[in-house]
Amino acid sequence: MAKVMRKIALDLGTKSCGFAISDPISNSFAIPLENFFFEENNFKKVINKLKHYEKKYEFDTIILGYPLRMTGTRSERSIMVEEFEKLLRKTFSQRIVLVDERLSTVKAKAMLKETNISQSKIKEKKDSMAAALLLNYYLNNFLGVR
């Protein structure tokens, strides 16, 4: 049986990043990993965390949430993610795919709220859940915005 190369997803913010990884057997579903908090705009910390995950898990694709406005146009956050994407490409050899993340955090919060956990736990888990939603979308559709 051939080894499955996993996928990892990131939901990047200015002070936190959610990570999710695909399952090791079939790449058919996403597993939330963690919400990683860092100093505002210190994206080198995110790169270092991704290097940690690269050692821990073998993955061949990095899925990066791409925040577009509801109209489909780019925003200030879109430009931030594009700059981070350039940093990823300089650092990693894996395929990098941008995936439209509109409403992913809203959906993640709603899903977590349904589990009756506290607001502080929702805040703690929302980004990794959003990353899992992005990754599930990619795994189910194999579509990216570029």
From Swiss-Prot:
Keyword Nuclease: yes
GO molecular function, one term: nuclease activity
Keyword Cytoplasm: yes
SUPFAM superfamilies: Ribonuclease H-like
SMART domains: YqgFc
This protein's UniProt keywords: Cytoplasm, Hydrolase, Nuclease, Ribosome biogenesis
Matching InterPro entries: RNaseH-like_sf, YqgF, YqgF/RNaseH-like_dom, YqgF/RNaseH-like_dom_sf
A Gene Ontology cellular-component term: cytosol
Source organism superkingdom: Bacteria
CDD domains cross-referenced by the UniProt entry: YqgF
Function, in words: Could be a nuclease involved in processing of the 5'-end of pre-16S rRNA.
Name of the protein: Putative pre-16S rRNA nuclease
Organism: Mycoplasmopsis pulmonis (strain UAB CTIP)
Lineage: Bacteria, Bacillati, Mycoplasmatota, Mycoplasmoidales, Metamycoplasmataceae
